Regions:
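Active-site diphosphate/adenylate-binding microenvironment
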Residues: 56-68, 72, 395-469, 474
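A glycine-rich phosphate-binding loop feature that marks nucleotide/adenosyl-phosphate handling sites
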Residues: 207-212, 437-440, 592
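Thiamine diphosphate
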Residues: 145-158, 356-357, 365, 372-373, ...
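N-terminal alpha/beta PP-like core and its mobile active-site loop of ThDP/TPP-dependent enzymes
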Residues: 26-383, 425-428, 508-511, 531, ...
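Phosphate/pyrophosphate-binding active-site segments
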Residues: 179-182, 220, 343, 347-436, ...
């Protein structure tokens, strides 16, 4: 491309002298870099014909208000901008949106430089661990360096190229710094390639220098032509498929570990067909839960540390484990002590080679749906030995008693009884969600998900503070669903400000706050490793005055409809009224911090101190060493 002579400087200095391959350069349009970015976002479609970027969350500051703020205002009718109260939780809402949409759509989040940007680092890590797409657009310092150091700029004495946004590098799947307007011509396609590639999916960070946002450039018009990003469905390698088929055919007691990739691939129907044809039972991870309905005969339920006895018993005896779309984190594998059959083989079907080859597994790199279909064809005639029908009957005979409504009495309700009350109030369109604290374990064990997409758990990063913002994101993704968020008082105190955002926007969902007056889950873990109760429950923290937080009043002050209940019966009555409420509906109930579901579960490696003056710790250390030895000799 050539510039008009009247506008051209010394040709060797022309920033547009480089012609990019694959981009038609005949016609151009002059835009600021920020305008070019938002125009490009609006032209990127998914294979269903919807804009891949559904909207932009924004908190403006000096690092993005003049450039991106002006550009977003210009497209506000086609690319909506949403205002939140905290950069981290805005990003949580965006990530939850994408997770509930099974990665077919995503959102962007923009902040100013400095603290606004670093607030999003936790959310980037959450998306990175969970393999979820989000486009992060933190403002950055001046590319010209003329006004250095600008307000909120980090100065590295030994590296002049560093800014606060370098914090995003280890928690981004793709990171770029836009310090020239033309950088967008390569950075944006790379960003969308990352967000739409099942094997490489995750957060993208484009650190956008604030002066460059406002700088104009003659962009090729062809750059803004609509583009459809198709979901790549990797087919299995013939050799890997043959080896996996041979291993499965040799197995008599195989089990499938269904992970989140089953949902993201849209493979739930393929999974059901596969297990029914070959009589292979499944165990569900937190991300994979609801891949099959809870009452399907071959769904053994939750696996691992927060798992149930049916799945864990079968996994311990299995002679082959077929992981499908799972990261095999320690809560799933019992710190690799669960799959204890010494003759056990492992096959991992995953789009990412990194996950497919973990712990010496036999890799089957493939899209989950396609991989299951091709495995099914190759396994014609194969059926595994039957699994005892009594396993699930016995399990639910135990745990259903824990979720029953209590009789009359003054005892505080348990978290299990709260789960039971919500279960009785739920229906087929209900989505329950959570992330951290006590409830992820109880929900994994106890919740009966009736169909795919009815269970939304962020348990990769297990980030306290995801819940309220995440519930809002889920409801924005699927407005017709009945969204119920479980959160403890500890998580609520960490991040609750998007309650006001939801109230302002009229986004309706239900929040059940179980108030056990502290970090009850970690208090139990502390006791379980021999530690004294210390600094977890509020009564065990340094204080002069007892804590007495009125969560219902606090939620109401942010615009929510709220109620405090004192019993399971009152909780059920309150939940029955949730359909009458517009905006967030908060129900608070006090619970006992000590009980949890003792049935099921498996060993989890939490290092216990080798030296302690407490006999309780020494006793737990001895048990820990025995467990380590058993795990390492299996």
């Amino acid at each position: 491309m050539r510039l008009k002579p009247s506008k051209m400087r010394n040709p060797t200095d022309c920033p547009q002298r480089h012609v990019l391959k694959g981009i038609k350069m005949s016609k151009t349009i002059r835009l600021t870099a920020a305008q070019a970015l938002v125009r490009y976002l609006g032209a990127q479609m998914n294979e269903g014909g919807e804009p891949f970027i559904a909207g932009v969350w924004a908190i403006f500051g000096h690092g993005n208000v003049a450039g991106l703020g002006e550009a977003l205002h210009g497209v506000r009718d086609s690319l909506p901008t949403y205002r939140g109260h905290n950069e981290q939780t805005m990003a949580h809402a965006a990530i939850a949106y994408s997770k509930q949409m099974r990665r077919t759509r995503a959102m962007a989040v923009t902040s100013s430089i400095g603290p606004g940007a670093t607030n999003m680092v936790t959310a980037a890590a959450l998306a990175h661990v969970n393999r979820l797409p989000v486009l992060l657009l933190p403002g950055d310092v001046f590319a010209t360096r003329g006004p250095d150091p600008v307000l909120q700029q980090i100065e590295d004495f030994g590296d002049g190229t560093v800014s606060a946004n370098d914090c995003f590098k280890p928690v981004s799947r793709y990171f770029d710094r836009i310090s020239r307007p033309e950088h967008l011509l390569t950075a944006l396609p790379r960003a969308f390639r990352t967000m739409t590639d099942p094997a490489d999916c995750g957060p993208v960070t484009l650190a956008f220098c604030q002066d460059v946002q406002a700088e104009a450039y003659d962009y090729p018009e062809s750059f803004f032509e609509p583009r459809v990003w198709y979901q790549r469905r990797i087919r299995p390698d013939e050799g890997e498929l043959a080896r996996a088929v041979a291993a499965i055919r040799a197995a008599k007691r195989p089990v499938i570990v269904a992970g989140g990739g089953v949902h993201y691939s849209g493979a739930t129907d393929a999974l059901q067909s596969f297990v029914e044809t070959h009589n292979i039972p499944i165990a569900e991870t937190q991300a994979g839960k609801s891949a099959l309905a809870w009452d399907h005969p071959l769904n053994l339920g939750p696996i691992g540390v927060t798992g149930g006895q049916p799945a864990n018993d079968i996994c311990a005896e299995a002679d082959l484990v077929l992981g499908i779309g799972t990261r095999l984190q320690d809560f799933t594998t019992g710190s690799w002590g669960l799959f204890s059959n010494p003759e056990r083989e492992m096959v991992c079907l995953n789009t990412a080679a990194y996950d497919a080859e973990k712990h010496g597994a036999m890799p089957l790199q493939s899209d989950a749906r396609v991989g299951l279909e091709e495995l099914g064809v190759a396994l014609q005639g194969y059926r595994a030995d039957p699994v005892a029908d009594t396993l699930k009957v016995e399990w639910f005979g135990k745990v259903d008693k824990l979720t029953d409504a209590p009789g009359d009495g003054n005892a505080l309700p348990t978290d299990m009884q709260v789960v039971g009350a919500v279960q009785r109030a739920a229906h087929d369109d209900t989505v329950v969600m959570c992330a951290a604290g006590t409830m992820p374990g109880e929900l994994h064990k106890l919740w009966k998900a009736p169909r795919p997409g009815a269970y939304h758990m962020e348990y990769g990063f297990s980030c306290m503070g995801y819940e309220i913002a995440g519930a809002m994101g889920i409801k924005m993704a699927q407005p017709d669903r009945d969204v119920i968020c479980f959160t403890g008082d500890g998580t609520y105190m960490m991040a609750n400000s998007e309650m006001a955002t939801a109230a302002m926007m009229g986004v309706s969902f239900t929040v059940v706050i179980t108030d056990n007056r502290g970090f009850g889950c970690i208090n139990r873990l502390q006791m379980g490793t021999g530690g004294a109760e210390f600094n977890n429950l509020l009564d065990h923290a340094v204080h002069e005055n007892p804590s007495a937080i009125d969560f219902a009043a606090h939620a109401a002050a942010m615009g929510a409809t709220s109620v405090k209940v004192s019993s399971i019966a009152e909780l059920e009555d309150a939940l029955a009224k949730r359909g009458e409420v517009t905006g967030p509906y908060v129900v608070v109930i006090d619970t006992d911090p000590y009980p949890s579901t003792e049935y099921g579960g498996t060993w989890w490696e939490v290092a216990v101190p080798e030296v302690s003056i407490r006999p309780e710790v020494n006793e737990k250390r001895a048990a820990y060493e025995v467990a380590i030895k058993e795990r390492n000799t299996k």
